[in-house]
Amino acid sequence: MPFEPPATRNYKKHFSSHKANLDPIEGVWTEYAVGTLSEDGKVIQRKEIQKRASWIIIKNKGEYQVLNEYGEQNKFIASFTRTSQKNAYMFNAFYFESKDHIKVEAILVNGNRLEMAYDAPPGVFEENYREILDTIHIQDPDKKLTLHWQFNWLKSFPND
């Protein structure tokens, strides 16, 4: 059996004992992602990442807080809030180091899949992909790179 952090186990216990009162977005989620790197509008690389991360979503004072599998928010503060549309949420994230802010709509599909997509903000892109940027900028400093992320979060707990 794979290692499960104590925080994830504890949140699973919480979700189990409060299952009747949970909102559909609350639970443990596994992130899958497709990143598309473009240079001056042309795709140069596309990468699919299975099980990129594990997230815990729990209601906290009118919003849904996003925690990593250890129950922390160590690189960014993130949350979902309801919108006026059914099954639609606004994802908000603030990255500590780069000071970038992401705000994008996320759709809950069939109660067990969250879908969202956005271009990585410049600071987050540079922070995580500096070696790619350095290589390309040495070759041609005028080239413009963008990284578009498509995310699917699949609910792993609780299952209906």
Where does each model-flagged region fall?
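A charged, solvent-exposed segment within the mature domains of Sec-exported extracytoplasmic proteins
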Residues: 86-160
